Swiss-Prot record:
It holds the Pfam family NAT. Belongs to the acetyltransferase family. This is Amino-acid acetyltransferase, mitochondrial. Residues 1-50 form a transit peptide. The gene is ARG2. The keyword Membrane does not apply. InterPro entries: Vertebrate-like_GNAT_dom. The lineage of its organism: Eukaryota, Fungi, Dikarya, Ascomycota, Pezizomycotina.
Length: 674
């Protein structure tokens, strides 16, 4: 595991130094929460937000109790385990270190083209001062003047309904994110029933104070309350984005950027200052979040303000008691991954058509309607990700998952209510979905992984989980183009003699398709031979984005059958001929999952087969997504299929095997076929 290797390959001196940091951190005093208001924002830019370790002050001589020290050690151990269990690959580790590591970690030596997918032997050891792999209360370094912080904008929905254990767990996770290089700007949405404005103000004040104190327990610098940084105008200002039709804007940017540069976690209540009267008023939390995203991205157009990026928004995190966006079938739990470019409209339509909750919230103590909340969250992440770089992503999860609480009797009622909404599935050993996503840029479960393949990693056998994941990862994503179009129906065997799709048709960019195949497989396709081979059997093609990934599928005939006989007898075999992803897109953005899902859900929902070399390292990925696999005796092929078990008969398997044995490869070299 690369993150483990990153620890073990350090020198002994560096290891001792990192360990001493952890030990010293136990003895640090807890600082009181800071508070920035509209009356003091003019001094924010002049204040220095240093911890005692940063400004040279000596740590306090007071020591924690034995119980506190034990709790601290257990907390550090839990987080270290969560990092080690993140299932990060070498590619993940390299990408993470280049984005969030120290300046030395980012200066990874250039590699030869042949090794671009792997971390070189020298890359990890050079990151000697990436001390976040040994987690204690890690000293957070202030950024240089020309650096901008990497941040997550976090929405906490209904925190007043969370008990202290739940809030503390979420606070710990957000503090760990900061230790790993991602600083949070937290917006509170307290939408409880209120009888007066005064009552609502009291709730907001109470919850911001609770959250600050919860964060403060996990080291310094702590949380900074920014109350007065969001302004509201009586008229909507001009916007750099058509999505930004809001009266809210960031009125004093230094109230946010100064404490962020010094490592603070920001707490922002959902209220704004009316410019004309300088009075506080309630504000929609989603509009506050969008205003912050626009400001950080340099898209806020206000007179007298520079249109420059003040922070890099890498994540939008929504922690909602209702959890992630539900799957089409409630029994399948939350959607693991959403490609917004392709799926937003259909998912919103599905949610809108769902039956409303007649009896209010299904979770005790939580107000609101799940259906409305899910649609609101879906629209929020779409609007924000539309103005952020394509590398940004959104995580929608529940407080229990964000806190990574293990099985606890105190949460049995709430957990049962969540499972009643999401359904019960087989799941693996629990991981923190937010930490996992930061380290890998992926959800815990692959988007193309069948529900039946989600299993425990502790023993190889299927297990029932005491609770199930309710987390959704959303990205701006890629458009998916499918020929022939599947919006009306899936692909069907063509009647002999009828026109069919050709790879030379004008709708297909053949040079880019060939480049995709050559780049993905690392070898040259014999294009002429391949075109001749598939011209009479092509079923269709799937293209992700600008030919970043794709699949070519065919209708193959078992040996000895002519086209007419195979069609009339229903024995044409749906076959995955080529599955390709550009090397630069492999392991990132879910391109492979997007293509695979389009194949099995839209094109061939009744099953498809393919072959792969027995020693192909991709076979594990294929195995997890298939419904069956068989090694073909006397050959170097393994055969996979996604056909439902009820449809797998002896004749079907014989035809599948015959096709997988008989397809002639079309490579220009003499190497063994892939």
């Amino acid at each position: 595991m690369p993150l483990v290797a990153a620890m073990l390959t350090r020198s002994n001196g560096a290891w001792k130094k990192a360990t001493s940091v952890v030990q010293a951190s136990i003895c640090r005093d807890q600082q009181r929460p800071n508070h920035t208001t509209i009356t003091s924002v003019t001094s924010v830019s002049q204040r220095r937000h240093f911890s005692s370790a940063e400004n040279g002050a000596k740590p306090s001589r007071s020591h924690p109790s034995a119980a506190e020290a034990k709790q601290k050690r257990e907390s550090d151990r839990e987080f270290l385990i969560s990092v080690l269990e993140s299932s990060a690959t070498k590619r993940d580790a390299k990408a993470y270190l280049q984005t969030y590591g120290s300046s030395k970690a980012k200066a990874v030596p250039k590699e030869s083209p042949a090794s671009t997918a792997l971390v070189s032997d020298k890359a990890i050891p050079e990151a000697k001062d990436v001390s976040f792999f040994v987690q204690g209360s890690v000293p957070v370094e202030s950024l240089e003047a020309d650096e901008v912080p990497r941040v997550a904008i976090v929405k906490l929905r209904e925190p007043q309904t969370w008990d202290d254990t739940l809030l503390g767990g979420v606070a710990k996770t957000l503090t760990r994110l900061r230790d790993l290089g991602l600083r949070s700007v937290i917006v509170l949405e307290c939408s409880a029933e209120k009888s007066s404005v005064l009552d609502w103000k009291d709730v907001v004040t109470q919850q911001t104070d609770r959250l600050q104190k919860a964060i403060q327990k996990y080291g310094t610098p702590g949380a900074e309350l920014v109350d007065g940084g969001i302004w509201k105008r009586s008229t909507t200002p001009p916007s750099a984005s058509s999505l930004g039709h809001t009266k809210l804007s960031v009125g004093f940017g230094e109230a946010f950027t100064a404490p962020l540069r010094h490592g603070h976690i920001l707490v922002v209540p959902s209220r704004a200052v009316v410019e004309e009267t300088l009075e506080h008023t309630a504000a929609d939390a989603n509009e506050v979040i969008f205003a912050l995203a626009k400001y950080f991205a340099g898209l806020q157009v206000n007179a007298g303000q520079n249109q420059t990026r003040t922070a890099v928004v890498d994540r939008v995190i929504i922690i909602d008691p209702f959890g992630g966006i539900p799957a089409r079938n409630l029994g399948d739990g939350a959607r693991v991954f959403i490609n917004l470019e392709e799926q937003f409209n259909s998912i919103k339509a599905t949610l809108s058509a769902a039956e409303p909750q007649d009896n209010g919230s299904p979770i005790p103590g939580i107000s609101g309607n799940p259906k409305a909340s899910h649609i609101e969250n879906l629209e929020l992440v779409k609007n924000i990700l539309a103005i952020l770089p394509s590398t940004a992503s959104a995580v929608i999860t529940s407080p229990i998952e964000a806190a990574n609480l293990q099985s606890n009797q105190a949460y049995d009622i709430r957990r049962d209510a969540e499972e009643a909404m999401a359904g019960e599935v087989k799941t693996r050993r629990w991981q923190n979905p937010i930490i996992h996503n930061l380290l890998t840029d992926r959800p815990i479960y692959s988007a193309s992984l069948p529900i039946g393949r989600i299993k425990s990693t502790t023993n190889g056998t299927y297990q029932r989980s005491s609770r199930m994941p309710t987390t959704t990862l959303a990205k701006k994503g890629l458009p998916v183009t499918i020929f022939p179009d599947t919006r009306t129906r899936s692909w069907q065997p063509p009647k002999p003699g009828t026109p069919r799709l050709k790879l030379t048709d004008t709708c297909v960019d053949l040079p880019r398709l060939i480049h995709l195949i050559n780049d993905s497989f690392g070898r040259k396709l014999d294009a002429e031979h391949y075109l001749n081979r598939v011209q009479d059997s092509l079923a269709g093609i799937i293209i992700a984005g600008e030919y970043e990934g794709g699949a070519i599928l065919t209708w193959e005939r078992p040996f000895g059958l002519d086209e007419e006989t195979a069609y009339n007898s229903g024995r044409l075999v749906p076959y995955l001929d080529k599955f390709a992803v550009l090397k630069k897109s492999q392991g990132a953005g879910g391109v492979a999952d997007i293509v695979f899902n389009a194949m099995v859900r839209d094109c061939f929902p009744n099953g498809v087969c393919w072959r792969s070399r027995k020693d192909n390292p991709v076979n594990k990925w294929y195995f997890e997504r298939s419904r069956g696999v068989r090694k073909l005796p006397g050959s170097n092929w393994a055969m996979f299929w996604t056909t439902p078990e009820a449809a797998v008969k002896d004749q079907v398997m014989e035809d599948y095997e015959d096709v997988c044995r008989g397809v002639v490869p079309s490579w220009a070299d003499s190497k063994a076929a892939d």
